[in-house]
Amino acid sequence: MTAATGLILYVHGARDPRWAEPFYRLRDKVAQRAAAAHVVVAFLEHGKPDLAEAAAAMAACDVVRIRIVPLFFGRGGHLREDFPRHLDDARRAAPLVEFELAEAAGENDAVLDALATYAVAAPDDSSSA
């Protein structure tokens, strides 16, 4: 990825801001691996920036191509029904930007393999018991 490339980690969002903390950690890890790209987390709802705001901010930094990575387990109603409207908003907010959509994270075999490995070896979380 080049400096003119943006990567948006697109997440659902939640009213409790602590919910987003793992996604910010993931953003930092992605930014380390794609050092030349602008990497942000954008929210479907209950968080800022939304997709259009993130796209506009990237366009203001001369980003010309944005890859949107939906961090959803599957292509449910939000990705099938809500996302197209949000993408239209992003295209209006950043009309000179080319957008590319990755598959939903949970539909990727490498992600499923990593989750299977985690599920088998997951440590106990006594803080939530």
At which residue positions do the language-model features occur?
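Active-site-proximal alpha-helix that buttresses catalytic centers in soluble enzyme cores
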Residues: 1-129
